[in-house]
Amino acid sequence: MKIADLITWFESWANPAWCESWDNCGWQIEPGILHEEARVLVCLTPTLAVMEEAIALQANLIFAHHPLIFSPPKSLRRGEAIADMARLAFTKNIGIYSAHTNFDQVEDGTADVLAQILGLKDVAPIVPTQGGLGYGRVGLLDPFLNLQELLTVIQTRLAPPDLIFSPTADLQQIISRVAVLGGSGAGFISAVAETGAEAYLTSDCKFHQFQESRDRGLILIDAGHYATERPACDRLVEKLRSLNLHWVQLSNQDEDFRQFFVK
């Protein structure tokens, strides 16, 4: 499949026009590769390590969730990450394409995959946007679990390096309704509280957001940005393989940019 055809297929599923105004979805760098057979390296975040991996694997497209460029840089200087990525993209003929908030909303996108991993039933968006799409997912556990069992499921299936949850939570509380949103989801706490969810799995939560959740009677669970979004990259690879692409692989150089000290 040509890269142009691949992008057309993807954008019929997750149109970049659906992204937020502050976001930058779609082509980050297109060095003239649209008519080449697609050799795709999928990653969460486009970094120099991923670019070097793409060069070594002779990939011609880095398909990332996070954008390389959020706002137009005022200058490009050698030694700066974006500048070096751009230089390598053009000299090695490797495109960089990002699907961010558009991919968050769709079926088999970041939130939908999290809901599937937890086995949620009767799933709906936390914040609907259009035609059954929307941010986050909320649904029922089947069977219901107590909080300790739910935390164990999350730890086992997502393998986060650290799992933070509301300190006043009762580990024996039965949880029936769970909300999920991959990546930075603390801004949706008010919307989640209105869904009747008893627990909310997301990431990047601050001190006072845990306080807000406690005051609303919502158990907030922070599994980290990487652990809550990387599974959707795995799913994207599966979907791309179903298209019989010439070559597609999940990056082995993706990074969780946080490290935890263990005594």
UniProtKB/Swiss-Prot annotation:
Q: Which UniProt keywords apply?
A: Metal-binding
Instruction: Please list the residues that bind a divalent metal cation 2.
Output: H66, H225, E229
The superkingdom listed in its UniProt entry is Bacteria
**What is the protein's quaternary organization?**
Homohexamer.
Quote the cellular component terms of the Gene Ontology held in the record: cytoplasm
PANTHER family named among the record's database cross-references: GTP CYCLOHYDROLASE 1 TYPE 2 HOMOLOG (PTHR13799:SF14), NGG1 INTERACTING FACTOR 3 (PTHR13799)
Specify whether Metal-binding is a keyword of the entry.
yes
Q: What is this protein called?
A: GTP cyclohydrolase 1 type 2 homolog
Report the sequence similarity comment from the record.
Belongs to the GTP cyclohydrolase I type 2/NIF3 family.
GO MF term set: metal ion binding
SS bond list: none
SUPFAM superfamilies, per the entry: NIF3 (NGG1p interacting factor 3)-like
Q: Transmembrane ranges?
A: none
For a divalent metal cation 1, which residues are the binding ones?
A: H65, D104, E229
